[in-house]
Amino acid sequence: DLDASEINLALADYVYLKGNFTGSLTGSQNGKQYAIYNLAKPLFENLKSGSTISNIDFKDVNIVGTYDSAALARNAENARITDVSVQGRVSVVGNASNVAGLVVNGTNTQITNSSFTGTILSNNQHIKAYNVGGLVASLKGGESLLSQSKADVTNISGARSNEQRIGGLVGRLENNARITKSY
């Protein structure tokens, strides 16, 4: 297991790992399951083509961001996320922004057998457009699929216009992205 609170982030750091990630991260080895505890920022900035995240738990997450926030990544493009669970709280303060439990923006990304349990808080002081989702704030592209996943989320939002979209699983689903067997 890894305790993210042992990593010193500067106030200006908005993620733990900046830039593009194209590798794989798995939380299991030799039959043992591992977790990352106490995330205070999203783990990745960008998951890019070929990246895979699997079999990992994020526990006691407490993220307070000022812009696009989620536990795993701000952006996932052509990524594969399987058997990932997040437990805790993710919030944005300041300017209205996108927020989700797992990934902020997913494009042509497949998320399978993953979950979020906890609270998502979005700023309610502005009327700027934003998306809030239990798992993904915005999921788009014909190759995007959210399947066999769930969110048990308390969503605290103060939407003031029809440009502020809030969903239990996904805040905004577009461009032929699909959800199957998820709740």
Summary of predicted features, one role per range:
Residues D1-Y183:
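Surface-exposed repetitive/solenoidal architectures
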